[in-house]
């Protein structure tokens, strides 16, 4: 997971992960804000959960989780991504892991797009059904994707729209299967969410990638 502005959410995330059943959780945190490092470290010290931090000197957004996943890929076939503004029950991580498959990603936020594609006219898919986009908040994915150097060649101006880029690389460049997960999450409304400042960029990036061949009728 990544952290940036909300250290007060981190203890709740730890408690949710501590409560998971049927799995052994190890948490890797990419922190984009050195100013909250001490708060995060203190919370982790009070938890029985194994936690490893990377405190980055500048905010690189959700791309940080891709760097963590690349480090883990040689030894772990799958990784689960969560966000700090999510609430989830004790069986959630086990459900995600039960859906793990080679060359695939399964996640809670999963959509298809109309033609012509428009990000904000996206169409939700049912649980277990194929998607063209899967968000990184509440996802299990084959870590082989993080050994593909193309994933780290995202255009600089769209670096903070890494969720769209990941779906493009997985779906279009690699032909992977994307699906809606059967796991359930609740989200905490928060105006500090980085997503709120990327409304225009998400559609611009989708159009940019469509011009490069993604989301054609198939």
Where do the model's predicted regions map?
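Active-site beta-to-alpha loop of glycosyltransferases that engages the nucleotide-sugar donor
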Residues: 1-12, 33
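Short, acidic, metal-binding catalytic loop of nucleotide-sugar glycosyltransferases
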Residues: 15-26
């Amino acid at each position: 997971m990544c952290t940036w502005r909300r250290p007060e959410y981190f203890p709740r995330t730890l408690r949710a992960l501590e409560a998971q059943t049927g799995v052994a959780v190890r948490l890797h945190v990419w922190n984009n804000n050195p100013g909250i490092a001490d708060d995060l470290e203190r919370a982790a010290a009070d938890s029985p959960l194994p936690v490893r931090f990377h405190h980055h000197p500048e905010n690189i957004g959700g791309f940080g989780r891709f760097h963590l996943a690349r480090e883990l890929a040689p030894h772990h076939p799958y990784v689960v991504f969560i966000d700090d503004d999510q609430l989830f029950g004790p069986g959630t991580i086990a459900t995600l892991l039960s859906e793990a498959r080679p060359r695939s990603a399964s996640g809670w936020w999963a959509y298809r797009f109309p033609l012509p594609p428009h990000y904000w006219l996206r169409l939700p898919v049912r649980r277990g059904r194929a998607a063209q986009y899967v968000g990184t908040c509440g996802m299990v994915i084959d870590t082989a994707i993080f050994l593909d150097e193309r994933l780290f060649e995202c255009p600089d101006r769209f670096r903070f729209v890494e969720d769209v880029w990941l779906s493009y690389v997985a779906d279009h460049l690699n032909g992977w299967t994307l699906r809606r997960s059967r796991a359930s999450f609740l989200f905490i409304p928060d105006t500090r969410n980085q997503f709120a400042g990327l409304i225009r960029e998400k559609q611009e990036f989708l159009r940019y990638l469509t011009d490069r061949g993604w989301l054609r009728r198939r």
